[in-house]
């Protein structure tokens, strides 16, 4: 989903390097609704999406009205979001969402009251013999298809792309470029927040505010996914699966012979080769 977030921004002429921060706010929104409000999973997902969208809209606002580069503001908001969420969860070890024994947020799967916030698996866990395989992957694919339809088959999508290609021409055509810049970043942020909700509501992991002193890798992996897919929303489905297989596979390598960082090296080489292919295609 962070790959789709970055790809969407690319398609509308913006560089959303703030997907990590938007992902962080989305994670907090999903976990807060699940743990504190005991809401069902679909409500938690909506809140995660809204928070991610708000966090993405702020750099968009600065870009639209003050012409401040979205890369600078989104990088700043990455770190603001990270430390804000860590403090809200940890609260000096007394936070109601924080499990002191495990130094993480409360496990949604350990309580019948909290487990209703988990995304249903419809037998996928039994099929794949895991405890975190849910319908999240199908929801993500459906959203990717929806984004493709919006960008390529609707007037709204055409306006967003037109503003990205040429703001002045879009303005002369009667398109409100400021509104569309903010909307583009808000939608990109919402996609990243939605992805965080899918991840944490599938109970893949719990948030650790003590270890979370670096930004979630998913936010930056999204850049690789978007580049590999050439910013095609449908392509992000397959490039995300490919990149995630490399990343997860690296963690299972024998450290006696290979460092786990070799997976990052492979991903980096792939991205460089993708960039070279675009260069050669442009010359041809």
Question: Model segments located where?
Answer:
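Cytosolic-side transmembrane-helix boundaries in multi-pass membrane proteins
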Residues: 165, 172-179, 250-284
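Transmembrane alpha-helical segments in multi-pass inner-membrane proteins
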Residues: 191-193, 202-268
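Transmembrane helix-bundle core of multi-pass membrane transporters
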Residues: 78-153
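Single transmembrane alpha-helix segments in multi-pass membrane proteins
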Residues: 1-36, 49, 53-57, 61-68, ...
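Hydrophobic core segments of alpha-helical transmembrane domains in multi-pass membrane transport
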Residues: 1-6, 27, 31, 49-54, ...
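Helix-loop-helix "hairpin" substructures at the membrane interface of multi-pass membrane proteins
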Residues: 2-6, 54, 121, 128-206, ...
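Alpha-helical transmembrane segments of multi-pass membrane proteins, especially transporters
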Residues: 19-27, 44-52, 70, 74-78, ...
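Interfacial loop-to-helix junctions that mark the boundaries of transmembrane helices
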Residues: 18, 41, 122-136, 254-264
């Amino acid at each position: 989903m962070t790959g789709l977030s970055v790809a969407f921004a690319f398609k509308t002429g913006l560089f959303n390097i703030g997907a990590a921060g938007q992902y962080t706010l989305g994670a907090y929104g999903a976990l807060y609704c699940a743990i504190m409000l005991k809401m069902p999973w679909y409500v938690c997902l909506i809140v995660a999406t809204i928070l991610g969208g708000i966090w993405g809209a702020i750099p968009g606002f600065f870009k639209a009205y003050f012409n401040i580069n979205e890369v600078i503001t989104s990088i700043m908001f990455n770190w603001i979001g990270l430390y804000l969420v860590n403090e809200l969860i940890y609260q000096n070890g007394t936070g109601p969402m924080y499990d002191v024994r495990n130094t993480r947020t409360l496990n949604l799967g350990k309580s019948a009251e909290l487990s209703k916030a988990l995304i249903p698996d419809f037998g996928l866990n039994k099929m794949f013999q895991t405890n975190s395989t849910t319908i999240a992957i199908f929801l993500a694919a459906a959203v990717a298809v929806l984004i493709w339809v919006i960008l390529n088959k609707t007037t709204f999508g055409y306006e967003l792309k037109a503003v990205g290609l040429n703001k002045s021409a879009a303005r002369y055509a009667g398109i409100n470029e400021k509104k569309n810049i903010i909307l583009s970043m808000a939608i990109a942020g919402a996609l990243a927040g939605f992805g965080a909700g899918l991840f944490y509501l599938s109970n893949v992991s719990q948030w650790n505010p003590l270890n979370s002193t670096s930004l979630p890798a998913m936010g930056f992996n999204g850049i690789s996914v978007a580049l590999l897919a050439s910013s095609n929303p449908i392509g992000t489905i397959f490039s995300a699966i490919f990149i995630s297989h490399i990343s997860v596979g690296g963690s299972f390598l024998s450290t006696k012979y290979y460092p786990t960082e070799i997976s990052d090296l492979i991903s980096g080489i792939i991205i460089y080769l993708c960039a070279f292919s675009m260069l050669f295609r442009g010359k041809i």
